[in-house]
């Protein structure tokens, strides 16, 4: 009862060290107190549906239509995630790993990403984790998966500074994520260029292949 935080202070602590580390470390919650916090949280979200950021639905729809997968790794409960996606008319996720998982299978543990890769036959570089908090970043880094920071979630300078410095991609606006998914990262773009040079343009103009190869190496 003697501890109090402003909303911005809470955001900082939720970012790092994360919610459970805050509860068990700085606040020293007992198991009973953590269970009470969980019940309070569930009562709160039961009657409150968050509204998706403008543009998110269109991004997810295009991603699915292009053959992409949507996986949710969250500290929310699966039933709440399914409801929120449904109420916001978002594409149904292909897989969800929520708070109902045992602690050792929640982020920042890499278990959810390992399951996603195994289920869909993907390599780490074929995934992209999009998150606004450090536990998601830590999970992606430990699994060798590219990470894009959802910078539109807050305007806290320390968080933005960390994300810009350490993440593969920093998306300040939702539209930045749209551009990232449509354009791809640099290695992917270079691979596409080499395929075009060798299989398409190269058939008619073989001399283009070493030119493109040199440009790709520089990039």
Spans of features found by a protein language model:
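Residue-level marker of alpha-helix boundaries and capping positions
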Residues: 10-11, 50, 72, 126-128
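Substrate-recognition element of Asp-dependent hydrolases with the DxDx(T/V) motif
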Residues: 37-38, 59-88, 97-99
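Residue-level marker of regulatory loop/turn positions in helix-turn-helix DNA-binding domains and
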Residues: 52, 73, 105
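Asp-based, Mg2+/Mn2+-dependent phosphohydrolase catalytic module
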Residues: 78, 82-219
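N-terminal helical cap/lid subdomain that shapes the substrate entry/recognition surface
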Residues: 1-57, 65-66, 213
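A generic structural signal for short coil/turn motifs at secondary-structure boundaries
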Residues: 46-47, 70, 104-107
């Amino acid at each position: 009862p003697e501890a109090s935080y402003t909303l911005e202070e809470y955001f900082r602590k939720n970012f790092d060290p994360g919610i459970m580390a805050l509860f068990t470390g700085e606040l020293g919650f007992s198991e009973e107190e953590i269970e009470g916090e969980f019940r309070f949280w569930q009562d709160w979200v039961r009657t409150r549906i968050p509204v998706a950021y403008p543009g998110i639905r269109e991004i997810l729809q295009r991603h699915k239509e292009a053959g992409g997968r949507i996986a949710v790794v969250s500290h929310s409960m699966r039933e709440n995630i399914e409801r929120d996606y449904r109420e916001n008319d978002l594409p149904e996720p292909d897989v969800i790993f929520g708070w109902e998982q045992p602690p050792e299978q929640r982020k920042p543990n890499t278990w959810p990403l390992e399951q996603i890769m195994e289920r869909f036959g993907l390599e780490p570089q074929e995934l992209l984790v999009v998150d606004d908090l450090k536990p998601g970043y830590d999970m992606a880094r430990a699994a060798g998966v590219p990470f894009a920071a959802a910078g539109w979630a807050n305007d806290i300078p320390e968080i933005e500074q960390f994300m810009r410095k350490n993440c593969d991609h920093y998306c300040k606006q939702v539209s930045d994520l749209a551009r990232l998914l449509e354009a791809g990262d640099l290695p992917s773009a270079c691979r596409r260029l080499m395929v075009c040079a060798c299989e398409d343009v190269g058939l008619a103009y073989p001399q283009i292949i070493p030119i493109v190869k040199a440009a790709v190496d520089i990039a």
